[in-house]
């Protein structure tokens, strides 16, 4: 299957419109977007139950798949940074879905926080997602040496337009990182 070389969106073997948009805004960003599954009906149903209905037990369903993916790539990354969830939604749900999906398998280094409450991605159209104001901030942690990391893996649950992942990369870059930043999501 032919796809965008950066985000793997099905289509032509050239950068898709979303990746071209982000390349213009963040020309220094040259990482790759990786995912395990296409976001189709079974995965949509999974996320409906996991995130919308708050079925925490579903967090473990793909742990083996994520672990298999990670075993072949872990030596390439100095840090794995989870995309933070809106704290209000995490309290309502009872858990942070990104941490729930990845913490048992990946060595997460949470150095980002989401500030304020924003409309859920699922409730926004593509244009709104692409132009959402920066909701993330870098929170330095003791022992974390952001500037020493050469390659960072940003993890999130779903990749749609890339806006969330690009916004997190921009915050890390503004905080002094010049690392290559790849992304990994369960679904795209």
Predicted ranges, named:
Residues 1-188:
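Glycine-rich phosphate/pyrophosphate-handling loop used in enzymes and phosphotransfer proteins
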């Amino acid at each position: 299957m032919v796809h965008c070389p950066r985000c793997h969106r099905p289509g032509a073997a050239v950068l898709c419109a979303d990746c071209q948009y982000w390349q213009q805004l963040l020309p220094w960003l040259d990482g790759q977007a990786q995912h395990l599954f296409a976001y189709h009906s079974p995965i949509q149903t999974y996320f409906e139950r996991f995130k919308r209905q708050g079925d925490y037990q579903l967090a473990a369903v793909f742990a083996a798949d994520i672990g298999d993916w990670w075993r072949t790539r872990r030596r390439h990354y100095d840090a794995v940074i989870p995309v933070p969830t809106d704290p209000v939604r995490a309290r309502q749900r009872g858990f942070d879905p990104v941490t729930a999906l990845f913490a048992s398998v990946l060595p997460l280094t949470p150095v980002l926080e989401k500030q304020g409450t924003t409309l859920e991605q699922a409730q926004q159209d593509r244009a709104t997602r692409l132009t959402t104001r920066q909701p993330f901030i870098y929170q330095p942690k003791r022992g974390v040496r952001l500037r020493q990391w050469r390659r960072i893996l940003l993890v999130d649950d779903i990749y749609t337009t890339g806006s969330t992942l690009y916004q997190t990369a921009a915050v890390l870059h503004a905080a002094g990182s010049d690392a290559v930043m790849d992304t990994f999501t369960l679904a795209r």
